[in-house]
Amino acid sequence: MTQTIFVLNGPNLNMLGKREPGIYGGKTLKDIEADCKAAGRELGLDIDFRQSNHEGTLVDWFHEADEKAVGVAINAGAYTHTSVALHDAIRAISIPVVELHISNVHAREEFRHKSMIAPACKGVICGFGPHSYILALHALKNITA
């Protein structure tokens, strides 16, 4: 049976490819989804890839993932730095969560240096461009095997 990984994306990630390409690169979220699904096939994983600009929807998806998946990769966007709700949703589920970011958030503005969700996650990957998603999938495959 193929294991499922949820890949969740937060606010403004639907704007990838248009939004600050000097920071985030030229790939769209659809491009990243295709890359994740291809990597998933190579790893024997089923990838459930989603994006929402709404915090409550992301919380609901964490709850759903706990029933349907073996792990979650999350690029929470700006919610990384503000969301106690996402922190609590991650703590509430029994499967591992990996936080990821396209850019190196620690080399950017001071307000991006603190993650509200990192303490609830198994690990954090950032700064490798869109490849951060693939690294997160490899990490989840390794810790759920």
UniProtKB/Swiss-Prot annotation:
Catalyzed reaction equations: 3-dehydroquinate = 3-dehydroshikimate + H2O
GO molecular function annotations of the record: 3-dehydroquinate dehydratase activity
Active-site residues, record numbering mapped to chain: 24 (proton acceptor), 101 (proton donor)
InterPro entries: DHquinase_II, DHquinase_II_CS, DHquinase_II_sf
Enzyme class: lyase
Keyword Cell inner membrane: no
Family classification: Belongs to the type-II 3-dehydroquinase family.
Protein name per its UniProtKB record: 3-dehydroquinate dehydratase
Organism: Rhizobium johnstonii (strain DSM 114642 / LMG 32736 / 3841)
Gene: aroQ
